[in-house]
A protein has these predicted regions:
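H-loop/switch region of ABC-family ATPase nucleotide-binding domains
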Residues: 79-80
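ABC ATPase "signature
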Residues: 103-104
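Helical segment within the ABC ATPase nucleotide-binding domain
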Residues: 59-71
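Conserved signature/switch motifs of ABC ATPase nucleotide-binding domains
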Residues: 18-21, 39, 71
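Catalytic Walker B motif of ABC-type/P-loop ATPase nucleotide-binding domains
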Residues: 44-47
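A short, surface-exposed alpha-helical micro-motif characterized by mixed small hydrophobic
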Residues: 85-87
């Protein structure tokens, strides 16, 4: 019952009887999120959750993560999806070569970055 509720939450209820090999990359990623949610975590970490997905699958995974943030769950995301990071974040850290170069609100980082590496990166991706 709990598993079905979690599958429903990520839009996979109709795939409950499917074998993993029959699922798309985005569906497998959402299923991984279901497995993590089954542990009832207080915090979830996503490390480039869309990097291995086809472009058409990216949105479905980002929608699930957005829903989790709206439900109040604390989430740490390592991502190059800057528009997404800006939309869902309360706080943004820009890390370059393992060093935190800049930290602030999405507005601070995306509209008025100070560090040259942040400025350069954002000019290339936005």
């Amino acid at each position: 019952e709990e598993a079905m509720a979690l599958l429903r939450r990520v839009g996979l209820e109709d795939k409950a009887e499917e074998y993993p090999r029959k699922l798309s990359g985005g569906q497998k990623q959402r299923l991984a999120i279901v497995r993590a949610l089954a542990m009832q975590p207080e915090v979830m970490l996503f490390d480039e959750p869309t990097s291995a997905l086809d472009p058409e699958m990216v949105k479905e995974v980002l929608n699930v993560i957005t829903d989790l943030t709206r439900s109040g769950m604390t989430i740490l995301i390592v991502t190059h999806e800057m528009a997404f990071a800006r939309e869902v974040s309360d706080r943004v850290l820009f890390i370059c070569d393992g060093v935190i170069k800049e930290e602030g609100s999405p507005d601070q980082i995306f509209t008025c970055p100070h560090d040259p590496s942040t400025i350069k990166f954002l000019s290339m991706v936005l």
